[in-house]
Amino acid sequence: MSEIKLNYHKTRFLTSAANIKQLPEDSGIEIAFAGRSNAGKSTALNALTNQKNLARTSKTPGRTQLINLFEVEPNCKLVDLPGYGYAAVPEQMKLQWQKSLGEYLQKRECLGGVVILMDIRHPLKALDQQMIEWAVSADLPLLLLLTKADKLSQSARSKTVKMVREAILPFQGDIQVETLSAQNKLGVDRLSAKLDAWFAPNFATE
């Protein structure tokens, strides 16, 4: 099979769901984007798709409370999961989000991979590690994307990547670590190549 290369610039908004029960049919391949409320998820999705307003960004962390689905091509979807861990969100709502996230990662059959976004200056917080555990226990491949990479010098970036790669060894899953800066598009090509690989089974010839 020749390598597929999807055009993420054609991605369009599909639908929003308040919980897993409201999601569309469990078919095709979905790739989920998860992260703390200030990790830059919406900004990363906008950089990937080269669309300024595809995923709505906000100065108020925790605004994305719904599961938002975007279609790259038929049967190829990106899923923007609710941001987790923001202090100003009521405890009850936080617990509800965490329950939904765990349920989605464990039960969604068409989930082909998970991108966990973390601010490169504050990686691997407790809730990030919880998400990694859930994904690994569900046998899902993971990409840990260290965002806002332009905030660090190149040597500090390399050092952080090395530290994160060593720290995740005990999880023993299929986990890769990359950096991303939406500001100067650093790492967007590597992100799209990883997504292409995860979507590839959709295009396998019979």
Swiss-Prot record:
GO biological process assignments: division septum assembly
Disulfide bond sites: none
Necessary cofactors: Mg(2+)
GO cellular component, one term: cytosol
InterPro entries, sorted: G_ENGB_dom (IPR030393), GTP-bd (IPR006073), GTP-bd_ribosome_bio_YsxC (IPR019987), P-loop_NTPase (IPR027417)
Binding site for Mg(2+): S42, T64
GO molecular function annotation: GTP binding; metal ion binding
The entry's keywords: Cell cycle, Cell division, GTP-binding, Magnesium, Metal-binding, Nucleotide-binding, Septation
Domain called EngB-type G: residue spans: 27-201
Keyword Chaperone attached: no
Residues reported to bind GTP: 35-42, 62-66, 80-83, 147-150, 180-182
Superkingdom, natural source: Bacteria
Protein family according to the UniProt entry: Belongs to the TRAFAC class TrmE-Era-EngA-EngB-Septin-like GTPase superfamily. EngB GTPase family.
Annotated PANTHER family: ENGB-TYPE G DOMAIN-CONTAINING PROTEIN, MSS1/TRME-RELATED GTP-BINDING PROTEIN
Function: Necessary for normal cell division and for the maintenance of normal septation.
Name of the protein this chain belongs to: Probable GTP-binding protein EngB
Organism: Actinobacillus succinogenes (strain ATCC 55618 / DSM 22257 / CCUG 43843 / 130Z)
Lineage, uppermost ranks: Bacteria, Pseudomonadati, Pseudomonadota, Gammaproteobacteria, Pasteurellales
